[in-house]
Amino acid sequence: MKEVSLRGISKTFGQLTVLDRIDLEIHSGEFLVLVGPSGCGKSTLLRMVAGLEPISGGDLVIGGERANELPPQKRNIAMVFQSYALFPHMTARENIGFGPRIRGEKAAETAAKVDHAASILNLHSYLDRYPRQLSGGQRQRVAMGRAIVREPSVFLFDEPLSNLDAQLRVQMRTEIKALHQRLKSTVIYVTHDQIEAMTMADRIVVMNQGKIQQIGAPLDLYDRPANKFVAGFIGSPSMSFIPGTVADGFFCTGEGEKIAVSAAAKGARAAEAGIRPENFVIAREGAGLTLVVEVIEPTGPETHIYGRIAGEPVRAVFRERIQLAPGEQVPVTAGSEHIHLFDKESGLPL
């Protein structure tokens, strides 16, 4: 497997810059996930690595070789698309073996590669079926099989699970992760779903507006977000933000309520406190912040509360069954180690 280096990579369409000097090192055998909202440039970046989109500036290096001008077929890369891109008139076997056949490989070699891919993906029972006879998950596995027989140095996945239902997405992300562990391949995976990113990645690259916001292991991003955007994007349910002021070791809301924060956050300044739903705890009467309940969602082991603190929407998840009604006021707090403070203007951590 090969390393992939992006050195000052940019992409422009006329006067519009969609990727702005991206620097990124993807290690050999790494499962790297590019995640971000729609329009952040992650799929464009993947297509540039694949050779499907010209590079406006910077250098793409694959396995130590500059690849900016290399045609896609010379990059030894395989790409799995969101839309499967299967030939409807070919069986699963023929779809998987299509690449080796058009490259002129011997029939016996092609058959062996197809058999190997089918074994990895548990597809033997479906090889003689046409795409219309397969489920969404089976079609995606056929598309993955077509990538495997290419024996690439790098696998590229462009939102491959977006067309699947929720249950099948969970199953397929497990299968893709298991495939990576078996092949020890270099994988660059694009998704807008941060749950996919958190559960599959060795490292995550969070992107927004054509720029990298943070790179790191999933739990590093979760525990130590580089800015308010990353804090709000990583995590499901997402972090709640409450505006106020930090002074003398306390965070104070505009309504005068306060909670203790880390000593490092001393000094009066406008700020926003970010608290993850699972870090809220019920406080003693008259302490903490007042949560005004709007919607209650009991899930069995947990109770999800939607409401407002100081007029701002928040979501709290309690690991117990709590009997509440809309309109009730509940005192809540969080440990200082779980309160993320961000500068009101820059969004950077305090």
Curated annotation (Swiss-Prot):
Its EC number is 7.-.-.-. InterPro entries: AAA+_ATPase (IPR003593), ABC_transporter-like_ATP-bd (IPR003439), ABC_transporter-like_CS (IPR017871), ABC_transpr_MalK-like (IPR015855), ABC_transpr_MalK/UgpC-like (IPR047641), Mo/tungstate-bd_C_term_dom (IPR008995), NA-bd_OB-fold (IPR012340), P-loop_NTPase (IPR027417). Residues 4-234 form the ABC transporter domain. GO terms for molecular function: ABC-type transporter activity; ATP binding; ATP hydrolysis activity. Keywords: ATP-binding, Cell inner membrane, Cell membrane, Membrane, Nucleotide-binding, Translocase, Transport. The complex is composed of two ATP-binding proteins (BAB2_0493), two transmembrane proteins (BAB2_0490) and a solute-binding protein (BAB2_0491). Belongs to the ABC transporter superfamily. This is Putative ATP-binding protein BAB2_0493. It is found in: Cell inner membrane. One of its GO terms (biological process) is carbohydrate transport. Probably part of an ABC transporter complex. Probably responsible for energy coupling to the transport system. One of its GO terms (cellular component) is ATP-binding cassette (ABC) transporter complex, substrate-binding subunit-containing. ATP binds at residues 36-43. Its main location: membrane. It comes from the Bacteria. NCBIfam families: PRK11650.1.
